[in-house]
A protein has these predicted regions:
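Positively charged n-region of N-terminal signal peptides that target proteins for export
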Residues: 1-5
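Short, aromatic- and cysteine-enriched interfacial helices/patches
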Residues: 8-12
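A cross-taxon signal for low-complexity, glycine/charged-rich
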Residues: 13-32, 40-48
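Flexible, low-complexity junctional segments that flank or bridge functional domains
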Residues: 57-247, 254-260, 275, 317, ...
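C-terminal "post-core" interaction segments
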Residues: 58-79, 114, 182, 220-378
């Protein structure tokens, strides 16, 4: 018998494409694990996580390094630690025990590592979770159907028409003032951080505008702290934006009580007081999905576009006997009404880019936002 360890993963806010393919992921910035609370309470929250997951951090015995042993280790990790098994059973009939029987039949003692990887990756894809990955030294499995089966609703060549040649860029943000005096911000990845002072500069410059478009289409996530930092510029009071539960035992429904998540107004910073339209598509995932959940409760905000890609579980990682790593969602995130956001968040105004508009170099979603903001001004 060999041993296996379960480790907290610091890459929650990232889509699979943003994962660094390493055998083990080290926590570099503890605040990136849980940005849902203010930094003042982070230390307390971190101790809560450690206490609740202490049993998962203790060395456990697992089967030997064989195809069957690695299969059993992976299946058990998901069975005891993955946080959406019961929810997905209700949503689309996921039966993890049936999955075990079906995929076990595909194992052979003499199968290659490549064949084993294929079987295990396909088993994990049954979870329909973009935050679940099997990682070797050379390969990472990915579940892509959370966006593959949907319209793109974003064309970068058309977006560049709106930005123009004289747009400004700070950190990961590009911004411009459109001809109808509507401010336009594009934030394509929360992996590209923007500092508080730079954010002040952007909002100050756009303060002359009648409304603001905040476009996060194709934002696959990144730093969760960016979700909280941006959202804090759109409220003047502490506001409840959601809840988070922690896995407390091996049962599919072993969770802590829901812990409230708040966004507090950015103190001594520029805050936006006018209407704002947040643009989304299916590629808005993970921490971008979390940002939309926060903005949903802001009274001056309207979400426009397509349903987001989801990805709301707080990920952990574990190691198999052969050294492969698995990332999985371990703690569910809910919106302010205690609804799951794992499969995405519906917009307030659902609209897709039309073929006619695209042929004319127009973005239907941006145009819808401009029309709305003009109406709100009147």
């Amino acid at each position: 018998m060999k041993t296996i360890k379960t480790n907290i993963l610091s890459l929650f806010g990232r889509s699979p494409q943003q994962l660094v393919r390493t055998k083990r992921s080290k926590v570099k910035n503890l605040e990136n694990i849980h940005p849902f609370v203010s930094s003042r309470s982070f230390a307390t929250l971190w101790m809560t996580i450690v206490i609740l997951f202490l049993p998962s951090c203790i060395t456990e015995e697992v089967p030997d390094n064989t195809p069957q042993g690695n299969f059993e280790a992976l299946w058990k990790i998901i069975d005891t630690k993955y946080c959406f098994l019961d929810y997905k059973n209700k949503e689309y009939g996921l039966d993890w025990n049936e999955i075990h029987r079906r995929y076990q039949n595909r194992l052979t003692d003499d199968m290659t590592n490549k064949q084993l990887f294929q079987v295990l990756a396909e088993m994990l894809n049954e979870l329909r979770d973009g935050h679940v990955n099997l990682m070797t030294y050379h390969e990472t499995s990915q579940y892509r159907e959370w966006y593959d089966q949907y319209p793109t609703n974003f064309v970068d060549t058309i977006q560049r028409i709106y930005l123009g040649k004289d747009y400004k860029a700070i950190g990961g943000i590009k911004y411009q003032i459109l001809e109808d005096n509507i401010g336009y911000i594009y934030y394509g990845s929360f992996s590209n951080a923007i500092g508080e002072s730079n954010l002040d500069e952007v909002l100050n410059e756009l303060s002359i505008c009648d409304g603001l478009i905040l476009d996060i289409r194709n934002n696959g996530g990144g730093l969760l702290t960016m979700s909280d930092r941006i959202a804090s510029r759109f409220t003047n009071k502490k506001v409840l934006t959601g809840y988070l539960c922690y896995k407390t035992g091996p049962g599919h429904n072993d969770f802590s009580r829901p812990e409230p998540i708040y966004v507090e107004p950015a103190t001594d910073r520029v805050r936006w007081q006018k209407p704002v339209a947040v643009l989304t598509n299916r590629h808005a995932f993970s921490s971008a999905n979390d940002f939309v959940s926060k903005m949903k409760v802001m009274p001056q905000a309207t979400i426009i576009g397509d349903k987001t890609g989801g990805g709301s579980g707080l990920p952990f990682s574990s190691e198999l006997p052969n050294g492969w790593s698995v990332r999985f969602s371990a703690s569910p995130l809910y919106d302010a009404d205690m609804n799951h956001t794992e499969f995405g968040i519906e917009p307030d105004i659902k609209v897709s880019m039309s073929t006619e508009d695209m042929s004319n170099g127009k973005d239907t979603i941006i145009e819808t936002a401009r029309k709305l903001l003009k109406e709100k001004k009147e």
